[in-house]
Curated annotation (Swiss-Prot):
Inhibited by nitrate. CDD domains: F1-ATPase_delta (cd12152). GO terms for cellular component: plasma membrane; proton-transporting ATP synthase complex. GO terms for molecular function: ATP binding; proton-transporting ATP synthase activity, rotational mechanism. This is ATP synthase epsilon chain, sodium ion specific. Produces ATP from ADP in the presence of a sodium gradient across the membrane. Belongs to the ATPase epsilon chain family. InterPro entries: ATP_F1_dsu/esu_C_sf (IPR036794), ATP_synth_F1_dsu/esu (IPR001469), ATP_synth_F1_dsu/esu_N (IPR020546), ATP_synth_F1_esu_C (IPR020547), ATPsynth_dsu/esu_N (IPR036771). NCBIfam families: ATP_synt_epsi (TIGR01216). Keywords: ATP synthesis, Cell membrane, CF(1), Ion transport, Membrane, Sodium, Sodium transport, Transport. It is found in: Cell membrane.
Length: 133
């Protein structure tokens, strides 16, 4: 059995996840980051995107992180995020509508392009999470 470590994901609404796992893959600002037990200490930004957990029994679970910061230590990783969601919590129709709305706003001078791009990124992350169940 592979070695495990504690993963805590904390959102403004409270503790989203708190359990021992074998591995988690998150999206950092420079690409994907796989975290295992005994990882070198690191603090990094977390980009909007999906995350994938593998438990010691090899069961898998994925979800969505809407940005944040991760503090990684050999025995524990803590992710503070703006929001986290499990695929079953995502309304796919609403996410697709948000994607379409954001795409229109990116090309409209009346809207803040940066905010529209962030909304697009969130919508795509939600759609990807829901489709990868």
């Amino acid at each position: 059995m592979a070695e495990t470590f504690r993963l805590k994901i904390i959102a403004p609404t409270g503790v989203f996840f708190d359990d021992d796992i074998e591995r988690v893959v998150i999206r950092g600002i420079e690409g994907e980051l796989a975290i295992l037990a005994e990882h070198t200490p690191l603090t990094t930004n977390v980009a909007i995107g999906t995350f994938n957990i593998i438990f010691a029994d090899k069961k898998k679970k994925n979800g969505t992180l809407l940005g944040g910061i991760a503090t990684i230590n050999p025995r524990e990783t803590i992710i503070l995020t703006d929001a986290a969601e499990w695929p079953e919590e995502i309304d796919i129709k609403r996410a697709q509508e948000a994607k379409e709305r954001a795409l229109k706003r990116i090309h409209d001078d009346k809207f803040d392009t940066a905010r529209a791009r962030a909304a697009l990124e969130r919508a795509i992350a939600r759609i990807n999470s829901k489709e990868n169940v």
